[in-house]
From Swiss-Prot:
This is Factor of DNA methylation 1. It comes from Arabidopsis thaliana (Mouse-ear cress). Highly expressed in flowers and at lower levels in roots, leaves and stems. The keyword Protein biosynthesis does not apply. The lineage of its organism: Eukaryota, Viridiplantae, Streptophyta, Embryophyta, Tracheophyta. Homodimer. Interacts with IDN2 and AGO4. Forms a complex with IDN2 and FMD2/INDL2. Keywords: Coiled coil, DNA-binding, RNA-binding, RNA-mediated gene silencing.
């Protein structure tokens, strides 16, 4: 059973069952996955990329097994087996996903008790009792405190006036990470060394001196009354150090998982792009091969036509030589007869008169032959000119065809180069780094080359358009000549000659007459055949009757007669295969020549070979055979 037969027999629901066969072949070693220490896909041998890493090959196999509609069921089953083989047999080749170790924060002497409750994001509190000598406006300026506390690196500072205690309250907000905690604890230690910690603030008595006290905000500050407590409860929340550490670890792991997923998805997208590029490259190679075959067929046909033309010219020259020899022979015969007549001059008067009469006839015949010789010479020269003109026209046509073929080849080559450049650019975009100067330079060069190719393609399309316009003009002239020939030969030539005018879509009466002769008497058969033929001719003209169907897909689709049409099936049952084939032939002709109007169309026809006649055949027939036809009629 061939692979194509297997593909036809595998449905989407049977993919998993069928995958057991290639899986067994993979385990037996029939299909090689590891070749010379490299991992390869045994089912994609035609791709440019052969060597894979384990993760790349696994992503390729799973991607194809769940692939798009362009993948056949056989390909999906094979790649599903490959994915299972990688999981079960080659799992040791899998590269572990690199994950940076989660290192707990090293805070040394600043590390807090894990069970202490802090305000998070980390915040520091500074209070400054206000004396009469103090500048209240300056102390309430947040910018002043931001500069004063700048060495602790707060991200924001807010100053409040606490009316009840006549103090200026300042809250310094730090980053939510461990560097922010270090800044808050450094602030607290700074004030402790100055004897201005929270403990000194709570234990102060009476009117203390005007100085600032500072500490790190904790739960009691969060729950306190006044502007400071309100701000802390609004902007922060209570957290233990262990909660914050656990949350940071979870966030870091989540980011790592997301990055790993993004890398896997990027690799899968890259594999899809690589597959699309390889498929396009293979398609382009097939187009190049087809173009090469077409060009070779064209060259062979051209050589064949040249050989036929050479043989035709040689035949004409041979016929000319033969006629010339025949004319020379007759001239020699006349000269010999004239000499014989001269020997009889001494005969009697009657004989002399007869001899004179014969000489006059001989002279007249000689003049006629000389005239015929001159006409033959002129005809020979005319034939040679016609042959040379025909050869020149044929060479012009061949040159035009070669030029069009060359333009088409160049255009197709440019289009394929453009497609290949686009594929390379897409791969470069996926593989390259935006900061890689070499990649950017290469992509710029490829873009410039792509622009040049597009400009060259536009020039070729413009030139091709001019050539196609000239070709259409030539075709229009040929069609006009055919129409004039059809109009002139209609009624003069018919099916009894090799070349004539046929009405395409008109029924042949002979099959109808033959079948009627078997069913009716001689007198009735002609009438019944004419009636039946006329009825079906009217049926052919009916545009609502469409006994056609489409076969094939894409560019290869064609419209053919539907053998299952009820009217045609009934006709075949009642009147036989010959009548059915006559109607079918007329349908095909009418659909080809006038599908919309559904009426017969005259066409120059080669009745001998059963095909449309060429202009050359018609002109040759008119110049050579029409004289014989006229002589037969007269």
């Amino acid at each position: 059973m061939s692979i194509s037969d297997e593909e036809a027999e595998i449905s989407e629901s049977e993919i998993e069952d069928y995958s057991e066969t290639p899986y067994r072949l993979l385990r037996d070693g029939t299909y090689k996955v590891k070749v010379n220490g490299q991992l390869r896909c045994p089912f994609c041998a035609g791709k440019k990329k052969q060597d894979y890493k384990y993760k790349e090959l696994y992503a390729h196999a799973t991607g194809v097994s769940k692939g798009s509609a362009t993948r056949s069921a056989l390909q999906k089953a094979n790649h599903l087996a490959l994915a299972m083989f990688l999981e079960n047999e080659l799992a040791g080749y899998a590269e572990p996903v690199p994950r940076p170790p989660v290192v707990p924060p090293q805070l040394d002497e600043t590390e807090p008790n894990p069970h202490n409750v802090y305000v998070w994001p980390w915040m520091g509190i500074v209070v400054n009792p206000l004396k009469e000598a103090d500048d209240k406006e300056l102390l309430l300026d947040s910018a002043y405190w931001l500069q004063t506390l700048s060495k602790f690196k707060p991200i924001e500072v807010n100053a409040f006036w606490v009316e009840q205690d006549s103090i200026v309250g300042v809250i310094a907000k730090f980053n939510g990470d461990w560097s922010g905690f270090a800044g808050a604890t450094e602030l607290e230690k700074e004030f402790e060394t100055q004897g201005s910690s929270k403990k000194e603030w709570t234990e102060r008595s009476g009117d203390s001196e005007s100085k600032a006290y500072g500490w790190c905000a904790r739960a009691d500050d969060f729950e306190s009354q006044g502007p400071i407590g309100e701000y802390l409860s609004k902007e922060g929340q209570l957290r233990t150090v262990s909660d914050i550490s656990q949350k940071n670890v979870q966030d870091r792991n989540t980011v790592l998982e997301e990055l790993s997923d993004m890398i896997a998805m990027t690799n899968e997208d890259l594999n899809k792009v690589q597959y699309s590029y390889n498929r396009t490259a293979m398609s382009l190679q097939r187009v190049l091969d087809e173009k090469k075959n077409l060009h070779q067929a064209f060259a062979d046909e051209t050589k064949k036509m040249q050989q036929m033309s050479l043989r035709h010219i040689q035949k004409i020259l041979y016929d000319k030589e033969k006629l010339s020899n025949e004319l020379d022979r007759k001239m020699r015969d006349l000269e010999s007869r004239a000499k014989q007549l001269e020997k009889h001059e001494a005969l009697t008067e009657l004989d002399r008169q007869k001899l004179d009469e014969d000489k006059r006839k001989s002279d007249a015949m000689n003049k006629s032959l000389q005239l015929a010789s001159r006409e033959q010479k002129k005809a020979d020269e005319s034939v040679l000119r016609l042959v040379e003109e025909h050869q020149r026209q044929k060479e012009d046509a061949l040159n035009k065809i070669l030029l069009l073929e060359k333009q088409l080849d160049t255009k197709q080559t440019l289009e394929m180069e453009i497609q290949e450049l686009k594929g390379k650019l897409q791969v470069m975009k996926h593989l390259g780094d935006d900061d890689d100067e070499a990649v950017q330079k290469k992509m710029k060069e490829m873009n410039d080359e792509l622009d040049d190719k597009k400009a060259e393609l536009e020039g070729l399309e413009s030139m091709n358009s001019v050539l196609m316009t000239k070709e259409r003009q030539s075709n229009d002239e040929i069609q006009a000549a055919r129409k004039k020939l059809i109009a002139g030969l209609t009624g003069l030539l018919g099916a009894e000659t090799d070349i004539g005018v046929k009405r395409m879509g008109e029924l042949d009466e002979k099959p109808f007459l033959d079948v009627c002769k078997l069913r009716y008497s001689a007198n009735e058969a002609a009438v019944e055949a004419a009636t039946l033929c006329s009825t079906w001719q009217e049926n052919l003209k009916n545009p609502s009757w469409q006994p056609f169907k489409h076969e094939g897909t894409g560019d290869g689709a064609e419209e053919v007669v539907d053998e299952d049409d009820e009217q045609l099936k009934k006709l075949k049952r009642e009147w036989g295969k010959e009548v059915h084939n006559a109607v079918k032939t007329a349908l095909v002709e009418m659909n080809e020549y006038n599908a919309s109007g559904r009426y017969t169309t005259p066409e120059l026809w080669n009745f001998k070979e059963g095909r449309k006649a060429t202009l050359k055949e018609v002109i040759t027939f008119i110049s050579n055979d029409i004289k014989i036809l006229k002589r037969k009629r007269t």
